[in-house]
Design a protein with these regions (language model features):
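Acetyl-CoA-dependent GNAT
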Residues: 2-77, 88-90, 94, 98, ...
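Conserved catalytic-core motifs of GNAT/GCN5-like acyltransferases
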Residues: 106, 119, 124-156
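Positions that flank functional sites
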Residues: 37, 110, 132-133
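Acyl-donor (CoA/ACP) binding surface of acyl/acetyltransferases
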Residues: 78-81, 85, 130, 150-157, ...
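Conserved glycine-rich acetyl-CoA-binding loop
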Residues: 71-89, 96-102, 109-116, 120-121, ...
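Acidic active-site catalytic centers that drive phospho-/nucleotidyl reactions
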Residues: 14, 111, 154
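Short Asp/Glu-rich motifs
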Residues: 41, 114, 137-138
Length: 166
């Protein structure tokens, strides 16, 4: 696997592959045009490749000295191979390099795998947003047992603090 910043050549082919992963991973995916906009300033996008196939992506927004991990996903057939870890490590390294004081993200309360990854990368749970995410009626990938209505799920808000600026 190689992690590569979005190259200007072949962007359309790459963005469509990444958008397919986004559509699979998200309950309410963005339109292709909205998704593509997130790979240009002020956003920062990166693709993870396995040979010539995109197997994951991350989108980050930097404003002044604060970053937000806007979206991250790994192709379902490529999970468990360290791609998510490589993407999170890359955005953290980018934040350190760009002197970001902190990075924020939100994650579904039921996404225990992602939460464990973020916590092991230094993110801390700061607060919970009640009934934040939409849940599909027959969405087997998400636990609806958090006490909310059948259509909503809580979001954990997590923060990483740059140790070089603390």
């Amino acid at each position: 696997m190689r992690l590569t910043i979005v190259p200007p050549q072949g962007f359309n082919e790459h963005i469509e592959q990444a958008h397919a992963i986004h559509q699979e991973a998200q309950v309410s995916p963005w339109k292709l045009s909205t998704f593509a906009d997130c790979f240009s300033k002020p956003y920062y996008g990166v693709f993870a490749f396995d040979n010539d196939k995109i197997v994951g992506y991350a989108i980050m927004l930097e404003v002044v000295d604060e970053a937000t991990l806007m979206d991250i996903a790994v192709d379902s057939g490529a999970r468990g191979k360290g791609i998510g870890r490589a993407l999170v490590d890359f955005v953290i390294e980018t934040s350190v390099k760009n002197a970001m004081r902190e990075m924020w993200l939100e994650v579904r309360e039921s996404n225990h795998t992602a939460i464990a990854l973020y916590e092991s990368s230094g993110f801390q749970h700061i607060e919970t947003r009640k009934n934040y995410y939409t849940v599909k009626n027959n969405d087997n990938g998400h636990d609806k047992s958090n006490g909310n209505s059948a259509q909503k799920e809580n979001a954990k808000i997590m923060k990483w603090t740059n140790p070089t600026l603390a």
